[in-house]
Every structure is written in C-alpha cells, then in structure tokens.
Amino acid sequence: MDNFDNVLVIDTDGHVYEGNVDLSSRMPEKWRSQAPIRLKDNEGNSRILLEGRIWSASQGPGPGVSGPMTEKARGYRPGMVDPVARLKDMDLEGIDMAILFGTQIALTVNGLMSGELATVLCRAVNEWLLEYCSADPKRLLGVGLIPCQAPQAAVKELEFLAKAGAVTAMLPTNVYGLKNMGDRMFDPIYDCAQSLGMPLSVHPQTGHDGVPGVSGVMGAGSERFFKYVYVHMTAFPFELMIAMMHMIGEGVFDRYPKLRVGFMEGGAGWLPFWAERFDEHIEKLAPQMPDLKRRPSEIIKSEQVTLTCESEETGLDRVFAANSENTVMYASDYCHWDCHFPYSVKDIIDGRDLSFAQKEKLLNKTAIDFFQLKNLPQANALKIARQSWENGNAQKAANA
C-alpha cells in the first residue's frame, strides 16, 4: 500500500463564514448604515439583509440553502470564523494548507445593484480574511473578493490583494444584470490578473435575492425550481459550464494567454464531454465566435484552465485520460452542508480510480503550479489525521 504520510495536502476550496462577522467596523463611516444585517428566516436558516433585500430567498423560485436534511449533512463549525479551531479541523481531516473562499457575502456581493457598496464590502471582507489567515500564513491562504460589476474598482482591489498576499481572487459565474464572464467589460480584470500573475477562481452559488432575472447570483435554471435540492444539483456544475464556455468562446483565454482560471466546486466528470461538445460546435458555428482562436479542447487541456473535484467523485481516471493529469485539484468544501468533513482526504486516498502519482498531483502538485505556491509547510497533517481516523476522534468531530 502506498504511504501518503509524507504527501503534502492542499485544499483548494475551503470556506470561511464571513456572514457571521460584524463587518460594519471595517467599513467607512458613511457606509456603515448599509452593512449586512444578520437574521434568521422562518426555518432558522442564516440570512443577511443587504440593499433592503434578504439574501438568499428561502422560498419561491431558486431558493438558497433551505429545507430538511438528513443527519449526513454537515453543520456550521467554529473553524469557519476562528482560525485556531480551523487549524485543528485541518489536522483532523489531513489538510496541510487551505485556500479559503468566503460564503455568505462572497457569493452575494456581485449580485448587488450598487458597485460602490460592493467595493466597500469586498475590502471589508478581504481585510477580515487576511487577518484570519495571519494566524498561520503558511497553512491558511486567502481568496480575495473583487467587485466585478465595477471593473476599475476590481482592478484596484486586485492590486491590493496581490500586495497583501492573497493567492487568487474569486470570480462569480455572472454578475448583477446577468452579465456573463466572457463579456468585454471584464477585460480590465483579466488584463490586471495576467499582469500580476494572479490566477482567478470562478465559484458558483445558489440562492438569490428573490428577483429572478435581475440578481446576478441566481444559478442557471434556478428560477424553474422551488426546492433547494434541484437548485443545488443544477446551479453548481451548470454555472461553471456556462462560465467556462463563455470565457473561451468570447476569446478571454486568447486575449490573455498567460491568464489562469480555476473553476471550483462543480465536479470534474463533465469536462471531457463539455470539451468534445464545444469542439463539435466550433466545427459548424465558428463564425459566431470570431474572438476564439483555438479549439476549445486545446484551451481546456492547457495550463490556463483547472478545476476541482468532489472528494467522493468517481471517474477521475477518465478525466485525466481525456484531458490532462494536471487539470484537477482536491477540495474539501469545508464546512458546507454537502462536504465530507473530516473524511474528504481519506476519500481521495482510498479511491481506486487513480494511481499514487495521480493522487499526489490531485492533492498538491497541480495546486502548487496553478496558484504558484511558495513557502510550503512540511507535510504533517495526514499523519495526525490517520490517528484521528483510527482512534475515533474524527467520527466524534463529524457527529458534533
């Protein structure tokens, strides 16, 4: 049996929960009256009030996280706001480094009508997240938040994030007004990211503000569903497929050949199908995409594109064979309801689809290259986690 104890494990999509943080003190005084207000809906779900609207809607078309769940659904953990607790949970799971996305504000801010408010909130969240990561800067790495509906402000925030040490910045799958990510309005963002050498990470979302067709954070097809289960199943992979398609088709990767973009939390199994389907459409409909200079599959197989897998996902061997062994990265999704804490790393290690070398690429090598990570910690978490798996401490944490 292969020994993974000395393998560095990098989680490329973990989450904090900035919705539980009072951001008002981090906002300029004139904006503090518009700071997010935390509240509970009738089911006890956490929601925020922004721009006079509740995010996300709990009922109606395209609801956010809501409805009954089984005991296997994971709950909120203190590590999402407390970095010391987070580091302990990382040891339980076998994670040496975690790349951290926001949740409630991060997945909302690009749906706001006011680009100015979005800009202020991005800075407030970024400053809090950087402070969170300072608890152990080798192990906790921040994903910056930028106001994409205000591209020039987003450029300034990217420059701030690069100097502050963020390893990537989050892109939504679309922004307020339902602008897709291949739109030329976002070129200043892509130009800046390429110049800085900073990769961008597209992260989908579910839920919206109750105004279908207006909010930029409603997933594809969500307005047709009144149950969260259908919204979640479709929004995450479909929105990534759309964002990737539009960015490729509108020539983003050709205009910016050194730009690197990750597509997070939508699984990986769909990638060979999507590349093949896109190539087929180009053979017959290329005149409709004059800015596309290469076959879509060529771009998807290049170092410009990567994505994350689900820890329990099967069939990754087919993705590696069809695309590249340097395309897919491990992600825990800690600690959202659908994550597999504290067993996501164990899922990868125990999986039968991939060789040891392929799993090592999945767990660290692809992430190191994509995010250009330096100053790596010593691999140690898996040794600790293995003990917790064997002595039952991991199960106790899962049941807590």
Per-region residue spans from a language model:
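Short active-site segment of divalent metal-dependent hydrolases/proteases
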Residues: 16, 206, 336
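Short glycine/proline-rich turn/loop motifs
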Residues: 62-77, 107-112, 225-233, 304
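Catalytic pocket-lining loop regions of alpha/beta-barrel enzymes
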Residues: 120, 133-141, 146, 151-152, ...
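Active-site flanking residues adjacent to catalytic metal/cofactor-binding acidic residues
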Residues: 10-12, 202, 264, 332
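Active-site-proximal gating segment of KS-fold condensing enzymes and close homologs
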Residues: 116-132
